[in-house]
Amino acid sequence: MTGGLRDGEKEEEFLHSPFIRKQGNIYKPYNKDMDYDILNEKSMEDVHTKEIDLVNRDPTHLNDDVVKVDFEDVIAEPAGTYSFDGVWKASFTTFTVTKYWCYRLLTALVGIPLALIWGIFFAILSFIHIWAVVPCVKSYLIEIHCISRVYSICVHTFCDPLFEAMGKCLGGVRIRTSKEV
């Protein structure tokens, strides 16, 4: 089978088979353009080797709802009760530096073990979801399908005529309310 080769054409001249070239991509029938660079980039990209952004460490804005506490949010002096300017500057510096270094120290000591624990937790969660939850749900849906058909037949056989008859009997009932003074 030539797969759509014209006279004089060789199969080596094409990036993809002539059948796909003439007929289009099998997944998108009328798409004759197959960009192999994009396909290779998508298939070669590995999530374990991607670079992380050290500047924007919350690209999905996961912590936007978390309270961001600055010095001005915690300590404020109302008008007329100001401390010395030097004390105010020293307090600001002490608060900011202490918060900064305590956070860094805590993340250095506890961050890596917690990252390990959360990595294990989400790996287990993914494993359970992929290998237990989804197959159980799919099995349940397959098994319940035959029961739902029997249930549907019973409802249409027994309940539908009963409720249609009740609807016809009670459909003519009219209620009139009047207010007596």
Curated annotation (Swiss-Prot):
GO cellular component, one term: caveola
Pfam families on file: Caveolin
Tree of life domain: Eukaryota
Ranges lying in the membrane without crossing it: 108-128
Subcellular location: Golgi apparatus membrane; Cell membrane; Membrane, Caveola; Membrane raft
Gene Ontology MF terms in the entry: molecular adaptor activity; protein kinase binding; transmembrane transporter binding
Main location: Golgi
Lipid attachment points (S-palmitoyl cysteine): C136, C146, C159
UniProt record, GO biological process: caveola assembly; cell differentiation; negative regulation of endothelial cell proliferation; regulation of cytosolic calcium ion concentration; T cell costimulation
Recorded family membership: Belongs to the caveolin family.
Binding partners and assembly: Homooligomer.
Function: May act as a positive regulator of T-cell coactivation. May act as a scaffolding protein within caveolar membranes. Interacts directly with G-protein alpha subunits and can functionally regulate their activity.
UniProt name for this protein: Caveolin-1
Lineage: Eukaryota, Metazoa, Chordata, Craniata, Vertebrata
Gene: cav1
